[in-house]
Amino acid sequence: MSAAPERPVAISLTNLRKTFGSLEVLKGISLEAREGDVVSILGSSGSGKSTMLRCINMLEVPDSGDVTVAGETIRLQQTPNGTKPADPRQVDRIRSELGMVFQSFNLWSHMTVLENVIEAPVHVQGRPRAECIAEAEALLARVGIADKRNHYPAHLSGGQQQRAAIARALAQRPKVMLFDEPTSALDPELVGEVLRVMRSLAEEGRTMLVVTHEMGFARDVSNKVVFLHKGVIEEEGPPEQVFTASRSERFRQFLAG
């Protein structure tokens, strides 16, 4: 019986470096995620995990190194003011393949939930409005807030806002979902409803990179766990190995709290 074919690489980071002022936040990060991988990215505050995630869609531009999405490497150029993307249109195209969910929801407060979800598909991707509305309504039902379609974000709980943000990201039909601490701004009783949606996305086979403090999610849902410490990947592997037989003393201390 032949082995299953290896899944294509969805995201590849090679020797990524990033400095803010005199502080080197990423010190040569290399990481690979294949299609269908769920990668949980762990680390203490200031370890570089959110910066690494934000470099994937160029919200932060790395000083050096390569970011490759679905086989296409983002071209960078050195300028007197630092490193910049060489082709903004390339960045826009690659961003359209990446759904981003932020810690602070980042919904547009002057738009209803439905308007938030259809904004990018209609006005950025140029898809027919009626088609986008139908898809948005299905996504809102999918994340359990179909009854909130005409509400404004201020009238939603934090958990409902984050589920709306997930629907908004999915509406762009991304190849990869990026989550930057999606539950850390939520009241404890609201965390579960967001994690349930994320778990169901993983079960669909979606490619996900998740910066998180939720150890249960990392242990039970991920197929790869990455631990960053001071801008370096200290530990990486499947959760059953990382959580039970870690080679990193720092990671064991991190787990012990």
Describe the predicted segments one by one.
Residues 227-230, 234, 240-257:
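C-terminal boundary and immediately downstream tail of ABC-type ATPase nucleotide-binding domains
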Residues 1-7:
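Short, low-complexity, intrinsically disordered N-terminal peptides in bacterial proteins
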Residues 8-239:
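ABC family nucleotide-binding domain
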